[in-house]
């Protein structure tokens, strides 16, 4: 369970107009913050150890699902609240981009095979309890075979029961990264690729130095934030022209919940595995067999799919599995710990950080119980 929130910062002087801001880490948070600050007229420099493609970012591998009710089974109420916030905030953020990014809110479908019905019953009870406890979560819909077929015609006669979680969504993370890169170019952000940095490289506020430093490096910040750890995820991308799904589908499994997230043009992102490890070696044979076998049991059309990618990445995770913002020096903010919920909670962390910079305090962080602390 989460600990009590750390008291918010003492009020800080708002960021002056046309301030110079250095951002470390061009993953999801770093790009979002760079774009927002540049649009407000600040002079932004973005540093990253990898390339513009974001090949070192956990967010590039993710399925980018926005599923607060589904994730309530494995996370805390404040993360669920951040997920509800993100569902409304993402369309506003996407509207600022120079090119369209796939986004939909068709809900989440949960299905299971007959032998896994007891696990599904426990999951249903847990989700129903969470829905009653967290304001704003929609009531799930219990489906029979006809209901599953109506929700996903491609799964007709494949599952006797299912659960539909209305209003949940997803976006295309690869399209988003490209659109953010174009936005940053257009906004005049100075981007430094293959240029690792750490807070000690600058003295913010001194002549010739940035006014603020924002550290969004994920696991790259481990030397300065030693409680960070990596949680390995393994994901397979398939092109399956014979399969059409309208929404992310989760398969109840005795060991883990497998998800199938459909993107445009019959591209599917399949994942589930979560391993306590900093290991970024290629996907294991066991995970490959389990993920592909599970996909085939959901829809036999995956048998003729083509494997486009098999990826691994480690998500930056704090001991309580919750995100945090901390000030490690008078003008240095560190943002980290998005764990497996990156896209679902990034808008809240992004907006809270902007409030801290522009107002000196964050009512949003207090409302969402997002940890903000001095160290």
Predicted segments with their positions:
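Short hydrophobic core segments
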Residues: 22-24, 209-219, 350
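Glycine-rich FAD pyrophosphate-binding loop
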Residues: 39-59
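Helical element adjacent to the flavin cofactor pocket in flavoenzyme catalytic cores
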Residues: 162-212, 216
